[in-house]
Each structure stands twice: as structure tokens, then as C-alpha cells.
């Protein structure tokens, strides 16, 4: 039994596998050793396709949560969806050597890309995963061709106070009922996939490590980022003010496109995304990188 409550590893694996089963036929998985442990990655798409690395949100989002976009994105890309080290999923920290700093996260992702045989990649993330993706683009811009951020948290604006207050009971003493209640509050009338919701509940008590948190990226670093960025925001998000996030991003990022996804909340993404999200992402990722940047000649 975890200090955070009862945890049934078999139930979690079964719930995880049910969501993975929603991925396209032929999806495989690889385990990549890194200095921080073994990283589990779902892989789909043509072997010769341009690489795309997807990072999930925090909590029990897991790599599996990208199932609604996987088919569209894998038409043109070799998709690699990652389970974060130390978070619920199938990645395994190396003892106590999980990432503790932003620099550690950068080192972990560098090692993961090296292990996958990827030099330059398209990169995307949702929520906390978008925060990691943005930090990695700042850390190693030469490895990121194009970047999409799906309702990112703590990148351009803080959390709403009401969001933190509603999350507090679940964070202090997580139970399946509290997880369901919090997600129901944040997503409102958006119907949630029953298997995905069961995975969130099954993760209660998972022996996860404390996630890396920290300040927002430095404004001067964002202004210098020479990477095309697509920022998509949940119109009904209760996590933060989407208008504030978009406005702040436009003042800081030199190559950013912003758009609002109407009728969807933060925690409904990416699995309950509105129709057309996969195509919107695919169109952005199909475009060339910044003119003159390494790897863009002739595109």
C-alpha cells in the first residue's frame, strides 16, 4: 500500500492497456534506457516518417492519452508518445535517480532522443508536458524543428486560484471519487471517455515521484527562441485564462501561431479534443522550419 492510498498495479495495467488499445493497429512500444531510468514509448507511423515526440500532461495522463490524434499524426510522422519518468505509466525510474530539476529533464529528453536515434524532431506536449517541451526547445533548439503547445500550464501565465482550490482535496488525499469529482468540475459538460477516466482513477496511489516544477521560462529566452510554435488553448479551460496566455505568448515568442479550441476544457485534452485537432496539428507540423535554420534547407 502506498502512503497515498491503496494501489492495485494489475488494475492500473489493465486500465492502461484499454486506452492503448484505442491507438492505430500496428502500434508498438519500446523501452529506452536513460540515466534516470527506463522510458516507455508508444510508437506508430511509417518507419521513414519525420519523428514527432509527444509528451503527456501530469498525473495519470500517460502516453496513451494521445489516442484521438495518433491516427492523423501518424499519416506523415513516426509518432513517439512518452510516459514521463516518475509519473504514472510504464516508465521506471532508476532507484532514486529521477529528474529533480529542469536541467535534469533536459538531460533525460536528450538521452531519450539519442536512444531513439533521433537528432532533430517535431515536439509537442499538453499541459505539464507542454511545459517540459518548451523548456527542452529552449535547452536544445537545434533538436526541435517545430513545437506545438496544447493548453500549456506555467509557461506564460499562472493557475487560477479557483482551479488550485478545487484540486487541493485530490492532491492532499487522492481517492478515485475525488479524482472523478475534480475532473467533472473542470471539464463541465464535456463527455469523458470511460476507459480514460478509469485509468485516472486506477492511478490513485501510484508510487510516483515528485514532479519537477519551477518558474516560467525566462522572457529573454523565449524572445530568442528561433523555432516555429503553435499554441492551442482550451476555450473552456478552468486552469488559467486562455486570453491572457495567448496575449503573453504573442509578446514573447517571435514565431508563434495562437488559436482557441472552442467548447473544450483543459483536462478534456487531448483525448476528448474537438474534431479537426489532429488535422490542425498535422498541417502545422507539415510546414517547414524557420528559414535558414539547420535542417530546413530545401524544404
PLM region descriptions:
Residues 1-31:
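An N-terminal hydrophobic leader/cap segment in hydrolases
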Residues 37-89:
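Conserved HGGG/HGGXW glycine-rich cap/lid loop of the alpha/beta-hydrolase fold
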Residues 256-299:
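Catalytic active-site module of serine/aspartate enzymes centered on a nucleophile-bearing elbow/loop
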Residues 80-124, 278:
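Active-site loop/oxyanion-hole signature of alpha/beta-hydrolase fold enzymes
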Residues 158-163, 172-226:
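Conserved alpha/beta-hydrolase catalytic His-Asp/Glu region
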Residues 131-138, 144-174:
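Flexible "cap/lid" loop of the alpha/beta hydrolase fold
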Residues 127:
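Catalytic nucleophile serine of serine hydrolases
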Residues 71, 230-267:
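Conserved loop-alpha-helix segment in the C-terminal half of the alpha/beta-hydrolase fold
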Amino acid at each position: 500500500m502506498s502512503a497515498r492510498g491503496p494501489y492495485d498495479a494489475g488494475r492500473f495495467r489493465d486500465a492502461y492497456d484499454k486506452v492503448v488499445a484505442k491507438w492505430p493497429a500496428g502500434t508498438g512500444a519500446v523501452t529506452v534506457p536513460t540515466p534516470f531510468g527506463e522510458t516507455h514509448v508508444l510508437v506508430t507511423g511509417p518507419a521513414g516518417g519525420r519523428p514527432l515526440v509527444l509528451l503527456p500532461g501530469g498525473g495519470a495522463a500517460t502516453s496513451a492519452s494521445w489516442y484521438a490524434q495518433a491516427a492523423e499524426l501518424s499519416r506523415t510522422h513516426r509518432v513517439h508518445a512518452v510516459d514521463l519518468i516518475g509519473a504514472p505509466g510504464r516508465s521506471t525510474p532508476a532507484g532514486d535517480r529521477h529528474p529533480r530539476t529542469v536541467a535534469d529533464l533536459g538531460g533525460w529528453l536528450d538521452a531519450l532522443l539519442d536512444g531513439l536515434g533521433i537528432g532533430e524532431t517535431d515536439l509537442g506536449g499538453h499541459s505539464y508536458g507542454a511545459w517540459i517541451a518548451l523548456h527542452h526547445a529552449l535547452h536544445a533548439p537545434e533538436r526541435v524543428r517545430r513545437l506545438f503547445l496544447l493548453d500549456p500550464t506555467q509557461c506564460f501565465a499562472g493557475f487560477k486560484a479557483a482551479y488550485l482550490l478545487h484540486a487541493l482535496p485530490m492532491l492532499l488525499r487522492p481517492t478515485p471519487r475525488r479524482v472523478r469529482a475534480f475532473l467533472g468540475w473542470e471539464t463541465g459538460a464535456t463527455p469523458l471517455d470511460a476507459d480514460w477516466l478509469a485509468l485516472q482513477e486506477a492511478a490513485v496511489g501510484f508510487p510516483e515521484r515528485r514532479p519537477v516544477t519551477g518558474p516560467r521560462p525566462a522572457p529573454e529566452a523565449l524572445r530568442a527562441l528561433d523555432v516555429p510554435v503553435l499554441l492551442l488553448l482550451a476555450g473552456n479551460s478552468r486552469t488559467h485564462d486562455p486570453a491572457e496566455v495567448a496575449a503573453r505568448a504573442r509578446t514573447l515568442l517571435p514565431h508563434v501561431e495562437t488559436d482557441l479550441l472552442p467548447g473544450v476544457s483543459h483536462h478534456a485534452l487531448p483525448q476528448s479534443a474537438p474534431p479537426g485537432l489532429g488535422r490542425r496539428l498535422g498541417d502545422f507540423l507539415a510546414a517547414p522550419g524557420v528559414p535558414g535554420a539547420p535542417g530546413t534547407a530545401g524544404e
